[in-house]
Amino acid sequence: MELGLGGLSTLSHCPWPRQQPALWPTLAALALLSSVAEASLGSAPRSPAPREGPPPVLASPAGHLPGGRTARWCSGRARRPPPQPSRPAPPPPAPPSALPRGGRAARAGGPGSRARAAGARGCRLRSQLVPVRALGLGHRSDELVRFRFCSGSCRRARSPHDLSLASLLGAGALRPPPGSRPVSQPCCRPTRYEAVSFMDVNSTWRTVDRLSATACGCLG
């Protein structure tokens, strides 16, 4: 088919579509931005995943456990039990009732007490430390010696003669010689003696026989 001139002129005047710009630079820029974003997100610290395991066991409160044991804290010290309320002190015992005069007199004058009193007042051997210079024997010494002597009453050892003599003197029926008075009871005197030794100021040993008593008795 042949085209006329008019057709050519029509084709020559139809506008041709213009060439679109290339999209490759834009796509490349977008890819670069996405890679940078992924890199920044990958470098951020991640919290470690929690480990799976048995739950922690909580310490039981301190206190008394079955069997008399006591729970302990982590420090190893046992918790003291709460203080118990103090109990009131028991009342003091009631004082014994007062004894009548007769009972007290009977108790005070019992045979045991009378025997002890008589033994304390009776003739017996006694002992005491004394200085040698005080013996009156003329020895010069700075030492102390054990001096034993007899002392006490002998009223329970009086004979019928002693009892009669005391009665006559008390009634005035017996006139003793002037300047003297008879003794109406025995005397507590030593019955045995022992020697005593000591050192004088010249470092010389001295011994005195029959100086200290070893036994006593009522004589006379």
Curated annotation (Swiss-Prot):
UniProt cross-references to Gene3D superfamilies, sorted A to Z: Cystine-knot cytokines (2.10.90.10)
Keywords: Disulfide bond, Glycoprotein, Growth factor, Secreted, Signal
Glycosylation sites: N202
Annotated localization: Secreted
Function description: Growth factor that supports the survival of sensory and sympathetic peripheral neurons in culture and also supports the survival of dopaminergic neurons of the ventral mid-brain. Acts by binding to its coreceptor, GFRA3, leading to autophosphorylation and activation of the RET receptor. Strong attractant of gut hematopoietic cells thus promoting the formation Peyer's patch-like structures, a major component of the gut-associated lymphoid tissue.
Location, primary (coarse class): secreted
Pro residues bias: start-end ranges: 47-58, 81-98
Organism of origin: Homo sapiens (Human)
GO biological process, one term: signal transduction
Low complexity bias locations: 99-121
GO cellular component, as recorded: extracellular region; extracellular space
Database matches in InterPro entries: Cystine-knot_cytokine, GDNF_fam, TGF-b_C
Stated family: Belongs to the TGF-beta family. GDNF subfamily.
Assembly with partners or alone: Homodimer; disulfide-linked. Interacts with GFRA3 coreceptor and RET: forms a 2:2:2 ternary complex composed of ARTN ligand, GFRA3 and RET receptor.
Official protein name in the record: Artemin
Tissue expression per record: Ubiquitous. Expressed at high levels in peripheral tissues including prostate, placenta, pancreas, heart, kidney, pituitary gland, lung and testis. Expressed at low levels in the brain.
GO molecular function: glial cell-derived neurotrophic factor receptor binding; growth factor activity; receptor tyrosine kinase binding; signaling receptor binding
Prosegment location in residue numbers: 40-107
Region (Disordered): 41-121
